[in-house]
Curated annotation (Swiss-Prot):
It is found in: Cytoplasm. It comes from Yersinia pseudotuberculosis serotype O:3 (strain YPIII). One of its GO terms (biological process) is fructose 6-phosphate metabolic process. InterPro entries: ATP_PFK, ATP_PFK_prok-type, PFKA_ATP_prok, Phosphofructokinase_CS, Phosphofructokinase_dom, PKF_sf. This is ATP-dependent 6-phosphofructokinase. The active site is at residue 129. Mg(2+) binds at residue 104. Substrate binds at residues 127-129, 164, 171-173, 224, 245, 251-254. Homotetramer. GO terms for cellular component: 6-phosphofructokinase complex. It comes from the Bacteria.
């Protein structure tokens, strides 16, 4: 059984990460474990920037956005020699367990620490993209969804006033879950996501069909990287004759106080991660990751969830069908 654990946040920040850290710390202390907070993710692990945490270290954190431990992208961690330094830093402090909060890249780093150094690692899915396998939802997704929907509501006000077409670019990388959910909740007329082949002419045809039905304005929700928003706006305006403007929401989607569901999810996952570390699991095959499925906490080997065939969360086809019916 582990006696000392570390906790870090890695990759892009997500609302609810602080709540997850709090869940880990409070649950670990209740079990009599020592807890070290590692600053700036794997970079801090490599640079030996760790501090012992107590109950008061995480007071008033459940409602705060971002991550008070800090986060950083550290591609150098792929180097085995860099990982050896990180492992040495943990071994010298007697840390034998680690909770990593982040996406699939963060999971991969945790799995290597388990396989190469015997550290019992558990990953928690912290990303607004909802693109991690093994879980229905990730920490931060629902808060980002609220942010996007609020922006869509505001854009609808001005779009309807000017009978304009508005394009909203939503984060998500190669996963359209955030765009899809926001399109349904925001009543968007059109949607473009990575899971469905995107063609400009098809989108224009749909918009023209809407105009023919009497639509005076429209909101198009599109996942980042599918197209250049400014160029797409000009193309739509040229083809339809309707004024069209693009809005990139950007990093505002990552900020803000986490909504209640994210706080609950993060707290449950943090506590469950400690339970896993206290149980007599076999870590010879690698670390584990935590998820929520049908509102129940579950876990799986990290290697299974980051395998190429499982790396991305499943496409919510029923959500897409619903969205299309409501356009």
């Amino acid at each position: 059984m582990v006696k000392k654990i570390g906790v870090l946040t890695s990759g892009g920040d997500a609302p609810g990460m602080n709540a997850a850290i709090r869940g880990v710390v409070r649950a670990a202390l209740s079990a009599g474990l020592d807890v070290f907070g590692i600053e700036d993710g794997y970079l801090g692990l490599y640079e030996n920037r760790m501090k012992k945490l107590d109950r008061y270290s995480v007071s008033d954190m459940i409602n705060r956005g971002g991550t008070f431990l800090g986060s950083a992208r550290f591609p150098e961690f792929r180097d085995p020699e860099v990982r050896k330094v990180a492992l040495k830093n943990m071994h010298e402090r007697g840390i034998d367990g680690l909770v990593v909060i982040g996406g699939d890249g963060s999971y991969a780093g945790a799995d290597l620490l388990t396989k190469e150094g015997g550290i019992h690692c558990v990953g928690l899915p912290g990303t607004i993209d909802n693109d991690v396998a093994g879980t229905d939802y990730t920490i931060g997704f629902f808060t980002a969804l609220e942010t996007v929907v609020e922006a869509i509501d505001r854009l609808r006000d001005t779009s309807s006033s000017h009978q304009r077409i508005s394009i909203v670019e939503v984060m998500g990388r190669y996963c359209g879950d955030l765009t899809l959910a926001a399109a349904i909740a925001g009543g968007c007329e059109f949607i473009a996501i990575p899971e469905v082949e995107f063609k400009r002419d098809d989108l224009v045809a749909e918009i023209k069909a809407g105009i023919a039905k009497g639509k005076k304005h429209a909101i198009v929700a599109i996942t980042e990287k599918l197209d250049d928003i400014d160029s797409l706006a000009k193309y739509i305006e040229k083809e339809t004759g309707r004024e069209t403007r693009g809005t990139v929401l950007g990093h505002i989607q990552r900020g803000g106080a986490p909504v209640a569901y994210d706080r609950i999810l993060a707290s449950r996952m943090g506590s469950y991660a400690v339970d896993l570390l206290l149980q007599d699991h076999d870590y010879k095959k690698g670390g584990f990751c935590v998820g929520v499925q049908n509102e129940k906490m579950v876990h799986e080997l990290i290697s299974v969830c980051i395998a190429p065939e499982n790396k991305k969360s499943k496409f919510k086809e029923d959500w897409y069908d619903t969205a299309k019916k409501l356009f």
